[in-house]
Each structure stands twice: as structure tokens, then as C-alpha cells.
A protein has these predicted regions:
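Soluble metallo-hydrolase cores and metallopeptidase-like ectodomains found primarily
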Residues: 1-27, 103-221
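Extracellular/luminal Protease-associated
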Residues: 1-123, 130, 216-223
């Protein structure tokens, strides 16, 4: 799940871009591999996922798939859930790919009822290509058959076969539907509590955590 992605339906050859970082694309350039018009697949880790989306778009990719490689979070590092804490093959990391803070539709002004809002294509920091997280079980089905350019040794992950950069012969179709247009904008509420100090009543210690949640439960949001 990648929050702030756009809707899209694209089909293209797949290129493996390691972690999808600036230096990884520089390495691809040195190998003579272009991702323009391709679907790129990148490992999670070593940078914020929004940077991966930004760099994929900047280099001309039409979609980005991200997965947790078992070398970083999976059976290579220990027992997978439920026997252990590591990610199983179908486990998908969720999170935002927004490169910014606050409401991207109201950058620099309050996101209140009746506020002027930017259209999706005008929001700063929002990727304009479909971005989707997948499990390493699904990623293996793509990576196993990618051929083309040999990878630098440091790009080898933990799946039980030799990785290649591509492009081809593997193709994929990425379909993402963003239902914000049909669900609309909903209000959220903040909860504020004050414990007045006795020794330094005029000084403030501010402790906060986001109240909104990915789903049921309070582990992520209430814990900070």
C-alpha cells in the first residue's frame, strides 16, 4: 500500500533498480540501462519510500513496484511470522510516498472546510506515476525471469536465484485505483490534554502522536 499514489493502468518491461536511490540510477546510467517507459522494481530500505518514487518518476519510469527483500526483512535474517518476527513472503510494507508535510492539496495554508485546494497534478511532492508495494513472494515471480544486464554484486538480494537488471523479457501490468475522488475529504479531530506543572507552570513539554490510523488498532499511531 502506497499512500498518495495516483491511479493508473500501465504495462511495460520491468527493470530492477536495487534500492531505487540516486546512486543506483547513476549506476544504471554507467551500464547503459534506461528506465524510461519501463516499470521499475526496487527494494525497500536505505531511504524513504517517497525518494524512490521521486527518482523513478524523474528518470522516466511509468510505474514503481517496491518490495521488502528477504535479505533485509525476511527469512535471510531470521524466522518469518508467525514463527518469528521477520516478514513472510506475502507481507507488504505500507506507508506514504508523499515528499512533504501536511495536506498536499493546501501547501502553506490551513486545510479547513472551504479552503482552496490544488488539483492532483499540481500538488507538490506527490508522485505522478502509479506506485505499489508488493510482497517478496510476488517480486520473485518477476525478478526470477528478468535477464539483460548483469547486476553489480552489491545488488544481489536474498531470493534464491541470480538477479539481473533487465530490461525484459519480463513485462508486468500495474493497475492502481485511487478512490479519493469518490470518497471525498473527511474531517479528523485532535485530542489535547493538559497536565499543569507545579514547579515550572509557565514552561511547556509537548508530547504528541498522530491520531489517524492505517487500520484498526493503536500500535502505530498512539505509540508515536
Amino acid at each position: 500500500m502506497s499512500v498518495r499514489t495516483v491511479s493508473g493502468d500501465v504495462s511495460a518491461e520491468v527493470v530492477y533498480v536495487n534500492y531505487g536511490l540516486i546512486e543506483d540510477y547513476a549506476q544504471l546510467d554507467s551500464l547503459g540501462v534506461s528506465v524510461k517507459g519501463k516499470i521499475v522494481i526496487a527494494r525497500y530500505g536505505r531511504s524513504y519510500r517517497g525518494i524512490k518514487a521521486r527518482e523513478a518518476e524523474r528518470h522516466g519510469a511509468v510505474a514503481l513496484l517496491m518490495y521488502s527483500d528477504p535479505q533485509d526483512d525476511g527469512y535471510v535474517r531470521g524466522d518469518v511470522y508467525p514463527e518469528g518476527p521477520m516478514r513472510p513472503p506475502a507481507g507488504v510494507q505500507r506507508g506514504s510516498i508523499f515528499n512533504g508535510t501536511g495536506d498536499p492539496s493546501t501547501p502553506g495554508w490551513p486545510s479547513v472546510e472551504g479552503a482552496r485546494r490544488l488539483a492532483d497534478g499540481d500538488m507538490p511532492g506527490v508522485a505522478r506515476i502509479p506506485v505499489l508495494g508488493i510482497g517478496y513472494g510476488n517480486a520473485a515471480e518477476l525478478l526470477r525471469d528478468i535477464r539483460g544486464t548483469a547486476i553489480p554484486q552489491a545488488w544481489q538480494g536474498g531470493l534464491p536465484f541470480r538477479y539481473h537488471v533487465g530490461p525484459g523479457p519480463v513485462t508486468a501490468r500495474v493497475m492502481v485505483r485511487d478512490d479519493r475522488a469518490t470518497r471525498g475529504i473527511k474531517p479528523i479531530w485532535n485530542t489535547v490534554g493538559i497536565v499543569q506543572g507545579s514547579e515550572y507552570p509557565d514552561e511547556i513539554v509537548l508530547i504528541g502522536a498522530h491520531r489517524d490510523s492505517w487500520n484498526a488498532g493503536a500500535v502505530d499511531n498512539i505509540s508515536g
